[in-house]
A protein has these predicted regions:
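Feature responds to low-complexity, polar/acidic, surface-exposed segments characteristic
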Residues: 81-165, 174-194, 200-239, 252-291
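Short acidic-glycine-tyrosine-enriched beta hairpin
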Residues: 46-61
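Extracellular beta-strand scaffolds
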Residues: 19, 34-36, 44, 52, ...
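Ligand-binding loop in jelly-roll beta-barrel domains
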Residues: 66-82
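Conserved short histidine dyad/triad with adjacent acidic residue
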Residues: 10-21
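Glycine- and acidic-residue-biased ligand/ion/polar-headgroup-sensing regions
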Residues: 24, 29-42, 48-49, 78-79
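Boundary at the C-terminal end of the N-terminal hydrophobic targeting segment
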Residues: 1-2
Length: 291
């Protein structure tokens, strides 16, 4: 049913979710891809003072107003989005992959942390992950973050900021990464689907740094039982985002490590999180896996 937000209210949504409302509803897209649909009347981009056409994609950080004599539907067209809105509205969820719930679930067991972005819980699911963010997730999935944070070993990379020095030093000492050049890690470069899938294969002991060609990492992950065929296709079909890092990491936890139990079993045994905390985190996600 319809609800009223008397002040701007924020929601993190997933693909296919719809926010709708009548005349007077104001909407700001804080992140992600969203379009607007309406059959009559007008929707105004208040930021530019212009009307937008039905079916148009909306610009981030512009304020949109549903004008007279219409009801507008704001639909999430990307994997995720963050909307801020004020006025009379209804939210209609779609049965799509719930990346936001997976991010929240991983946060409860300390495997995923937000950035200092002031919206969307800092999850930044709409952004491409950096190579450093991918490396830190690998270290967490290995259950080795506490060791990494106390590492004072040498690392040769000139482009690593102070806060990331322990992670880079630890990963270099353990042979987890060689950087993009002898003295460059590529800290702020985007991580690819192939790179992150290769990291997962290493965490699950199906690969190692001896594997230098990572171009077929998703396919190798499929043959190892780490990814489904649908997941390989999805990774190949769209830009790789932090939403995908969350998804792959979430399902890696229920995957068997080469020669042993599941990755979650390994992390529980290492004391990274408890069995009860893990079970509670899984209960937070109700969407289905991509087949």
């Amino acid at each position: 049913g319809a609800q009223r937000a008397d002040v701007f209210t924020e929601s993190r949504l997933k693909q296919g979710d719809m926010l709708s409302g009548p005349t007077g509803l104001q909407v700001i897209v804080l992140a992600g891809n969203v379009n607007v649909q309406f059959s009559s009347g007008a929707v105004i981009d208040v930021t530019t003072g212009s009307e937008v056409s039905s079916g148009a994609s909306l610009a981030e950080n512009h304020r949109y107003l549903v004008a007279e004599d219409t009801t507008a539907l704001f639909a999430v067209t990307g994997k995720t989005a963050v909307l801020s809105y004020c006025g009379l509205y209804s939210l209609s969820p779609a049965p799509s992959v719930d990346y936001p719930a997976m991010a929240a679930a991983l946060k409860t067991i300390s495997l995923f942390r937000g950035s200092d972005t002031g919206y969307g819980e800092g999850f930044d699911l709409e952004k491409a992950p950096t190579r450093m963010e991918a490396l830190i997730m690998l270290i967490r999935l290995l259950g080795e973050e506490s060791e990494a944070l106390t590492c004072t070993a040498y690392q040769p990379f000139a482009d690593v900021p102070d806060w990331a020095e322990p992670y880079a030093a630890y990963a270099y000492a353990k042979g987890y990464t060689n950087g993009v050049e002898p003295t460059m890690f590529g800290t702020t470069m985007s991580a690819s689907a192939e790179m992150y899938t290769e990291f997962l294969l290493r965490a699950l002991r199906y690969s190692s740094t001896a594997q230098t060609d990572i171009s077929n990492a998703p396919e190798r992950a499929y043959f190892a039982g780490v990814l489904t065929s649908g997941e390989v296709s999805a990774l190949r079909a769209s830009a790789f985002l932090r939403a995908d890092v969350v998804y792959l990491s979430y399902y890696a936890l229920e995957t068997n490590v080469n020669g042993g139990g599941t990755l979650s079993d390994v992390l529980i045994a290492r004391g990274v999180f408890s069995d009860a905390a893990y079970r509670a985190s899984r209960a937070m996600v109700s969407s289905a896996r991509i087949g």
